[in-house]
Amino acid sequence: MSIGYLALTQAKPALEAQHGAWRSWYHYFPWEDWRKGRPEILDSSIEPRLKEWAARPPQRPTPAHPVSRQERVRICFGFDGAAWDEEKVLDRFELLYEAGLVEEASRDGREAARLWSDRPRLGAPMRFDHRRVLATAIGRVRAKIKYRPVIFELMPDEFTLFELQRTVEAILGPHLHKQNFRRLVEGAGLVEPTGEVKMRTGGRPAKLYRFRREVLLERPAPGVRVKPGKI
């Protein structure tokens, strides 16, 4: 049994003195990053190989599964017209592991991994089951920002709405519509203007906002309820 905890923190310069380095979680899960549109790795590497794996007969008898391999692939990765669910991070990684398509499957001696002669590099591997733990954490925080104001724990005390939007996008994966995002955040009463502005190079000053803490007492689930692709 392994238990993982996710801690939210802001980068500190002291980390460099400890010979550590920050890495985007998309370094390990590149197929989850939709900020510039559908990731190319899905079409070039993941979809054809997962469909090939799904069509293979099982190497040994396996317990009956209520959903076929083909349907699991379609549902988890949004292939063939299915919707992409940004919260299924762990489901997607476990499917790639089961299909033998990630380095951890080869390292663990999984039979499915030995069947690939052209296995691509799908993100950077991690030690032990750490990439699985990270996948679990990403899925949980993607779900939680929709009903709890955890996004503001990653923001400075004062921020612009553009900075807030970029942070939400970095967590959820996709690009969000600027005006719709602003209407949603302001309409939900999550932020309030500070009365100050932030100067930007080559543009108008941007208003500064802060998290409106009174919202915690006004309703039980004050999150940023965005749905990628629909905002």
Model-derived regions, located:
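Short acidic, hydrophobic short linear motifs in intrinsically disordered regions
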Residues: 152-168
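Charged, low-complexity intrinsically disordered regulatory/assembly segments
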Residues: 146, 161, 181-183
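Unchanged
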Residues: 1-134, 138-150, 167, 197-202, ...
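The catalytic Nudix box helix
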Residues: 5, 164, 171, 179
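Charge-dense, extended regions
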Residues: 188, 196, 208, 212-214
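Charge-enriched amphipathic alpha-helical scaffolds
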Residues: 175-195
